[in-house]
Design a protein with these regions (language model features):
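An N-terminal hydrophobic leader/cap segment in hydrolases
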Residues: 1-30, 42
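Conserved HGGG/HGGXW glycine-rich cap/lid loop of the alpha/beta-hydrolase fold
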Residues: 10, 37-94
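Flexible "cap/lid" loop of the alpha/beta hydrolase fold
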Residues: 139, 143-178
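Conserved alpha/beta-hydrolase catalytic His-Asp/Glu region
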Residues: 163-164, 180-233
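Short beta-strand/loop motif that positions the catalytic acidic residue
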Residues: 235, 241-243
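Conserved alpha/beta-hydrolase "acid-adjacent" motif
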Residues: 248-254
Length: 292
């Protein structure tokens, strides 16, 4: 097993460095959000165009920035983008002993509030873009009134986090570090069986090989106990769920159920999950946000 397959060595470059793109200025910071915890936040600001409202970007569980490079490389020349990496990712700096409770949706939600406070951003003025776990965190936060927005596009949200039986068994057990490479192999195998889109499969494999598996293990323990509230009537600003019928990992039926529960929620169907990571999706984003 190569060293990177336990999330420990030469994948660190995936979790640091501020990607620079034409037409924007970039900065990278580790923002304190909780005692002993800092999150990596990357910000792009257009150098020439007059930016519309700020986009705050919250990616999925363990998601690497590289998967979003095609979209952000284009989008950053016209919009100020604040890209937040949540605490289960390898990029988070954690200087305290951690437990399952440190990775609850409530904690992840509080982190977003702390980042907005750090940058003096008012949530009601934000256009949110999120994926998977990021979308779930936001739905929960919007519903309880912790966060709001000008608009929110929620790509492939999860109402709950279902793991295969064998994965549940591994998640609940205390695992020694030497087991981590085995877990990675099993996770890659499971994803490659489940995911049909080639681009999505490549992104997930790379992400799985790049994780801090202690963080991900504790995060999975917390998430497997979580589900969105049945009543999402607390959300009162424009939201859209974006998904693709080809995305078997997240599931169209689950996305449609969430749409039915969020008041006046719109549905944006895209050709593939990969499409939502590329620059072409900007036209769908603009249409929903009425920027075109």
């Amino acid at each position: 097993m190569a060293a990177e397959e336990d999330g420990s060595s030469n994948m660190d470059s995936d979790w640091s460095g501020a990607p620079s793109f034409p037409g924007s200025e970039v900065s990278e910071e580790w923002v304190p959000v909780d005692e002993g915890i800092k999150l990596r936040v990357i910000t792009w600001k257009p150098t020439s165009s007059k930016s519309a409202s700020t986009v705050v970007f919250v990616a999925g569980w363990g998601s690497l920035f590289e998967g979003w490079r095609p979209l952000i490389s284009e989008w950053s020349s016209e919009r100020t983008i604040v890209y937040i990496e949540t605490r289960e990712k390898k990029s988070s700096e954690i200087s305290k002993k951690i437990s399952e409770s440190d990775f609850s949706v409530d904690k992840l939600s509080s982190d977003l509030v702390a980042v907005l406070r750090f940058y003096e951003l008012e949530s009601t003025q934000i256009d949110w873009y999120s994926s998977s776990l990021g979308s779930t965190i936001l739905i929960d936060s919007f519903n309880c009134g912790r966060l709001s927005g000008r608009s929110s596009i929620l790509l492939a949200p999860n109402s709950e986090f279902k793991f295969p039986f064998w994965a549940k068994a591994l998640i609940v057990l205390p695992l020694p570090r030497f087991m981590y490479p085995i877990i990675v192999r099993l996770a890659v195998w499971a994803v490659e069986r489940k995911v049909k889109e080639e681009g999505q499969r490549i992104r997930y494999r790379r992400a799985l090989l790049s994780q801090d598996l202690q963080k991900m293990h504790l995060s999975a323990r917390s998430l497997m106990k979580y589900s969105l509230p049945d009543n999402l009537d607390g959300i009162s600003f424009p939201c859209a769920v974006m998904t693709a019928s080809s995305d078997k990992l997240h599931g169209m039926d689950r996305a449609m159920d969430i749409i039915d529960r969020i008041p006046n929620c719109k549905f944006i169907e895209v050709p593939s999950n990969q499409y939502a990571h590329e620059a072409d999706v900007i036209k769908e984003i603009h249409h929903f946000q009425l920027l075109e």
